Amino acid sequence: DWIACDVDSNSINSDRFGFLSDGRIVAVTYEYSDNDPSKQQVLVLNRVDAAAVTTKTELTLACLYLDYNLRSQIVKFNKSNPDYRIVVKDYSEYATDDDYNAGLTKLNTEIISGNVPDILVNGTELPIGQYAAKGLLEDLWPYLDADPEYSRDKLMTQPLNAAQTDGKLYRLPIDFGVTTTVGLGKVVGEYTTWTLADVNDALSRLPEGATVFNKYYTQAEMLQYCIAMNAGSFMNWQDGTCSFDTDEFRALLEFVKPFPAEYDWQSDSDDYESDYTRLKNGKQLLYPTSLSGFSDLYYTFAALNNDIRFIGFPREDGSSGNAFNASCTLSISTTCKDK
């Protein structure tokens, strides 16, 4: 358990690791930094008596697969904080080839029995909405507002507002990106709404044979995108029900019908063209992308000669078809004694 040794396993060079004759472990680590010089170190781990280790208050952190960046931050916290220590319990270790969700089942079983972790980490695996509805999670707004260093007026509130549920912040993203679609300004720039009808109208203005996304997208993939961006139209998160017997959903099915059920790779003899090239050549209407930094923006503007519009995915209610995404979010349980 590298975290228990205050070592970030992400930095360990796998071919520079071994055991000394006296049982000690030696490893070479490399830490990359954008701002400071990168560091390479030799670590030697000695076995010590547990009684000699400084006692700290333990905070249990539950996850299904620990995020790469979060792992590094946990190690830094454990090494620097004199009073508290985060103990990671990764429930993905319970998953099997036959039951991929065994870890989630194990976690839920422990929560039901009253063994609730202090911190919950979620990528997309945990039912955070259900946990919040059952009163298991703290509203994080009061903690942010009371913090002199990280109050909400010092943070970008748009991603936090998007993560709210009925005005309460049950999960805090450790980072964020924007999932959207990009099109040429000269093609989609005039639209003030972006519904399925608008997409079909814009597509009709391109040369015959043009596609909405890359030609490799199938019906199932397109339907998944459209449902994800219109989930609120089909699902009631409060009572846990959903309804797909609507004109709106039937319109989605009609929209994805022209896409192939499966792409025929064997019959495709065309040379590969990037999404940006297809956009500029009028062969493709939109390119779905995720923007996680200014470098992504810069590359997109440069690739399309600054003639771009981040118009997003079609939504029938006329609202923005863009969405925030995060590598993971953090939640605090209401049973945590050390908030």
Tell where the protein language model's regions lie, with residue ranges.
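Glycine-centered hinge/linker elements that transmit conformational signals in sensory
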Residues: 239-273, 313
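Conserved N-terminal structural module of periplasmic/extracytoplasmic solute-binding proteins
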Residues: 1-127
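A ligand-binding cleft/hinge motif common to bilobed small-molecule-binding domains
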Residues: 126-130, 291-306
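Short helix-loop capping/hinge motifs at secondary-structure junctions, enriched
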Residues: 170, 186-194, 335-339
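Short helices/loops that flank or line small-molecule/ion binding pockets
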Residues: 98-116, 120, 129, 201-205, ...
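Extracytoplasmic/periplasmic substrate-recognition and gating elements
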Residues: 301-339
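Loop/turn elements at helix/coil->beta-strand transitions in domains of secreted/extracellular proteins
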Residues: 82-85, 114-118, 168-169, 207-212, ...
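Hinge/lid segment of periplasmic solute-binding proteins
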Residues: 125-180, 192-198, 307-312, 331
